[in-house]
């Protein structure tokens, strides 16, 4: 038997040892105000071992949004699960996946995210920096089975959107240079090649192909680290991490659909 003091030291040593080998996980809940003025809760999770971050929230109309940043592959995924309009012949829900490159300044590293701790979850958070809206032409379809080459998370995040996974030609060119198999990509019809292809909101027939648009906004994301300056006794100035900076970022995706029936929400925009 260990003496009491030795037992405590032994248990503390085990905690330290296991803490070195187990992945560092974080789960934060942030209350934010959506573009329509309603409140929702963002759930942010980070896995520093697998090096990715997810952000999830539900919009006022019931749409469920998942954003995933894969730092190992420099890829981000937007998954949108939209409730269908049953009275107009749609299925119970419709899933979309948008896959594109992850830029270096979009969100803090997973290791930094995993170190954040929950503070005052009932306070409504407002982003410190407004980064505007990116308009993305998602003119290429991704084969679900082969998409794992881009990021293994596609099979988990986009399982409900196997026939609706989109990316951009400019991203495809970069991935091809990196040796990604080009057979997973299919260039979709565009108005430049088919003049009769119009935006879905201008298309009068539900069965005609058109260019659909979908807008979403991430109201609060930890986009960068804050650094403070410290001056020591030798009057030497050093910098150290002292917090995070939050940002708001919106996206508008334009993509081809085989019939307007798959883009009924565009009538309301």
From Swiss-Prot:
Signal peptide: 1-26
Pfam families: OAF_C, OAF_N
UniProt xrefs under InterPro entries: Oaf, Oaf_C, OAF_N
Keywords associated with the record: Signal
PANTHER family for this protein: OUT AT FIRST (PTHR13423), OUT AT FIRST PROTEIN HOMOLOG (PTHR13423:SF2)
Similarity annotation: Belongs to the OAF family.
This protein's name: Out at first protein homolog
């Amino acid at each position: 038997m260990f003496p009491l003091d030795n037992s405590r030291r032994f248990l503390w040593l085990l905690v330290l040892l296991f803490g070195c080998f187990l992945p560092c996980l974080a789960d934060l809940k942030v209350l934010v105000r959506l573009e329509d003025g309603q409140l929702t809760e963002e759930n942010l999770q980070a896995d520093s071992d697998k090096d990715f971050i997810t952000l999830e929230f539900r919009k006022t109309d019931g749409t469920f949004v998942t954003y995933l940043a894969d730092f190992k592959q420099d890829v981000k995924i937007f998954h949108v699960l939209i409730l269908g309009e049953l009275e107009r012949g749609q299925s119970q829900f419709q899933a979309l996946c948008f896959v594109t490159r992850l830029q270096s300044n979009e969100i803090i590293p997973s290791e930094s995210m995993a170190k954040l701790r929950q503070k005052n979850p009932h306070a409504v958070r407002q982003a410190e920096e407004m980064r505007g809206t990116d308009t993305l032409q998602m003119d290429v379809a991704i084969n679900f089975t082969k998409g794992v080459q881009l990021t293994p998370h596609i099979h988990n995040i986009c399982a409900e959107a196997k026939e609706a996974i989109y990316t951009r030609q400019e991203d495809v060119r970069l991935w091809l240079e990196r040796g990604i198999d080009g057979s997973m990509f299919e260039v979709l019809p565009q108005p430049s090649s088919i003049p009769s292809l119009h935006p879905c909101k201008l298309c009068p027939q539900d069965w005609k192909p058109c260019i659909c648009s979908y807008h979403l906004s991430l109201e609060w994301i930890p986009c960068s680290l804050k650094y403070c300056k410290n001056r020591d006794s030798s009057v030497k100035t050093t910098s150290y991490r002292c917090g995070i900076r939050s940002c708001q970022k919106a996206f508008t995706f334009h993509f081809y659909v085989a019939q307007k029936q798959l883009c009924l929400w565009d009538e309301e925009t």
